[in-house]
């Protein structure tokens, strides 16, 4: 029989909230008896937006804004039913995007 694995990808703009959420997930999974690998930091995605400061002319005067998306990967190997139930009841901050693959 093949090993079961739950793969959780977390995304957030703030890395502190992301790390706190990852620690909550790892702690919950370990408490319920599953083995955990991670959190693995994935490359940070950086989007840069350049806009003109002036409305009408002065093209040389520009302003740049950037948005960084931090990502983490957590693998839960051989999860028990208690692990899945505990993860479903876990309350995480609203700034974290969670993607779960079974």
UniProtKB/Swiss-Prot annotation:
Highest taxon, organism lineage: Bacteria
SUPFAM superfamilies reported in the protein's UniProt record: Ribosomal protein S10
Single GO MF descriptor: structural constituent of ribosome
Keyword Repeat appears in the UniProt entry: no
Matching Pfam families: Ribosomal_S10
GO biological process: translation
Name the record gives this protein: Small ribosomal subunit protein uS10
Taxon lineage: Bacteria, Bacillati, Bacillota, Bacilli, Bacillales
């Amino acid at each position: 029989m093949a090993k079961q694995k739950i793969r959780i990808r977390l995304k957030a703009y703030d890395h502190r909230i992301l790390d706190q959420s990852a620690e909550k997930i790892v702690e919950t999974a370990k408490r319920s008896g599953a083995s955990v690998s991670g959190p693995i930091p994935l490359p940070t995605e950086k989007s840069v937006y350049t806009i003109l400061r002036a409305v009408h002319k002065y093209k040389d005067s520009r302003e740049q804004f950037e948005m960084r998306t931090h990502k983490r990967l957590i693998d839960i190997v051989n999860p028990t039913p208690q692990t899945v139930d505990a993860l479903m009841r876990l309350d995480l901050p609203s700034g974290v995007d969670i993607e779960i693959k079974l």
